[in-house]
C-alpha cells in the first residue's frame, strides 16, 4: 500500500504510525470500549466481552511499532452517555495500561461524552473540531465540521466512518472487509464555511481509518444506497482509493 511520507498503516492492523517530528505516534480510530454493554442495552444482543483482547492488542501495537504516543481518533468509548458500569471499568483498565507505557491523546468523538472529563488527568484531549499534531498531521473524528486549520496539514487522519467494502466472488459469494480510504481533500467541501482559501493549490491527503473494533459495523463504501456518516466526506473525498488491512489496493473506492 502506498504510504504518505508521514502516515503509514500497520500491515494487517486497523492502525497507522505517524511521524510527528519529535514523536512517533500510533493512531487508531473507533475503539468503542464497552460495545458489548451497549449492544446488550440497545439491541438485546448478548456477546462475550472482548475488553481484555482490545486492551492487549493496543498495548502490543504500541510496543511493536515503538510508538511514543497513542492517538485515538475519537469514539474511545461506545455508549453516547457518560461511561459507567462495565464500560467505565474497561476504559479505566485500558487507559491505565496504555498510559503506563506512553502518553495518550483522545480526539473527541460523538461517543465520547463525559470521557474527557472523567479521565482529564490521564488523557491529552483535542476537541471535536480537530487539531494539528507535530505541525503536519491533522486529526479529527469526523462527526462534525473540522476546523479549517486542518487544511494547513500535510495529511488529515479521521475516524467515525468505519469504512468497509463488500467483495463478491465469481459464484456470487460475498464478504465484508474493513478498509482504508485515501485521497486528496477538496478544500471547498471540507469545511463548513467554504470561503477559506488555505491550501487550495496543495490540499492535504485525507486518510479515513477503519474501525479498530471489528464489532462496530460500518459504511459499505462501494454499495449503492450507502451514504457517508460524516457531513463533509462525500464532497471532501470525491475520489480516492480503498485498501484492505493487508495493504491490497482495490482502486477507486466507489467502483470496487
What are these regions (language model features)?
Residues 34-36, 78-80, 110-117, 145-148, ...:
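Active-site environment of divalent metal-dependent phosphoester hydrolases
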Residues 24-32, 136-143, 156-158, 206-210:
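Active-site-proximal beta-strand elements of phosphoester/diester hydrolases
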Residues 119-192:
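A contiguous pocket-lining binding segment that forms or flanks enzyme active sites
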Residues 95-100, 149-152, 201:
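Short, conserved loop/helix-junction motifs that constitute active-site signature segments
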Residues 20, 65-66, 150-152:
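Glycine-rich phosphate-binding loop signature in dinucleotide/nucleotide-binding domains
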Residues 26-31, 35-133:
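Core catalytic region of metal-dependent phosphoesterases/phosphodiesterases
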Residues 168-256:
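Acidic, His/Gly-rich catalytic cores of divalent-metal-dependent hydrolytic chemistry
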Amino acid at each position: 500500500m502506498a504510504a504518505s511520507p508521514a502516515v503509514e498503516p500497520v500491515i494487517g492492523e486497523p492502525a497507522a504510525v505517524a511521524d510527528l517530528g519529535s514523536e512517533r505516534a500510533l493512531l487508531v480510530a473507533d475503539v468503542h470500549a464497552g460495545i458489548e454493554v451497549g449492544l446488550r442495552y440497545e439491541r438485546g444482543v448478548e456477546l462475550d466481552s472482548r475488553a481484555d483482547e482490545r486492551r492487549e492488542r493496543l498495548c502490543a501495537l504500541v510496543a511493536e511499532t515503538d510508538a511514543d504516543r497513542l492517538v485515538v481518533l475519537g469514539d474511545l468509548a461506545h455508549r453516547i452517555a457518560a461511561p459507567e458500569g462495565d464500560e467505565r471499568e474497561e476504559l479505566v483498565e485500558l487507559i491505565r495500561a496504555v498510559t503506563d507505557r506512553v502518553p495518550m491523546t483522545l480526539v473527541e468523538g460523538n461517543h465520547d461524552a463525559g470521557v474527557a472529563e472523567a479521565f482529564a488527568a490521564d488523557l491529552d484531549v483535542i476537541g471535536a473540531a480537530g487539531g494539528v499534531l507535530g505541525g503536519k498531521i491533522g486529526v479529527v473524528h469526523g462527526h462534525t465540521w473540522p476546523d479549517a486549520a486542518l487544511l494547513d496539514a500535510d495529511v488529515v487522519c479521521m475516524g467515525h466512518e468505519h469504512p468497509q467494502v463488500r467483495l463478491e466472488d465469481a459464484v456470487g459469494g460475498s464478504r465484508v472487509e474493513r478498509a482504508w480510504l485515501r485521497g486528496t481533500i477538496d478544500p471547498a467541501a471540507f469545511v463548513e464555511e467554504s470561503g477559506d482559501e488555505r491550501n487550495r493549490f496543495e490540499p492535504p491527503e485525507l486518510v479515513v481509518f477503519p474501525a479498530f473494533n471489528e464489532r462496530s459495523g460500518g459504511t459499505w463504501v462501494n454499495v449503492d444506497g450507502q451514504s457517508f456518516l460524516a457531513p463533509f466526506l462525500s464532497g471532501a473525498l470525491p475520489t480516492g482509493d480503498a485498501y484492505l488491512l493487508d495493504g491490497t489496493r482495490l482502486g477507486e473506492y466507489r467502483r470496487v
